[in-house]
Regions:
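Active-site-proximal alpha/beta segments of enzymes that process anionic O-linked groups
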Residues: 2-111
Length: 111
């Protein structure tokens, strides 16, 4: 995966910026996900994913890639699916599969 991402970054048709300012708001990581997937900014109050993620249709990357390129998409997150309303928002964004904390095996020993 990294060689592919590197090729996108170094392509002459790619715009890349080295001086970027943090735009997340009250939604924290959910705002970052919203911006990456949809291009929309976070809300001043609350989380976009919580307030609008399950009720509105957004033109998100997974949906666009599925519709225009036939891609199947999956998303992985180590927290519960209901946290920041991810279980609903990810479906609205067009993800085919969502693997949350219940999918992963938890280990007490991290060594």
């Amino acid at each position: 995966m990294t060689p592919f991402l590197n090729s996108l970054y170094h392509s002459n048709s790619t715009l890349a910026f080295s001086n970027v300012f943090n735009q997340v708001k009250a939604g924290k990581t959910s705002d970052a996900e919203t911006m990456i997937e949809t291009g929309l900014f976070g809300l001043n109050q609350g989380s976009f994913m919580v307030n609008y993620g399950g009720t509105n249709t957004q033109q998100a990357a997974p949906f666009i890639l599925s519709k225009n390129g036939g891609y199947t998409s999956a998303v992985f997150h180590g927290n519960t699916g209901s946290f920041w309303n991810r279980n609903t928002a990810y479906k609205q964004w067009g993800y085919n599969y969502f693997f949350d904390a219940s999918y992963f095996t938890k280990q007490d020993d991290t060594n």
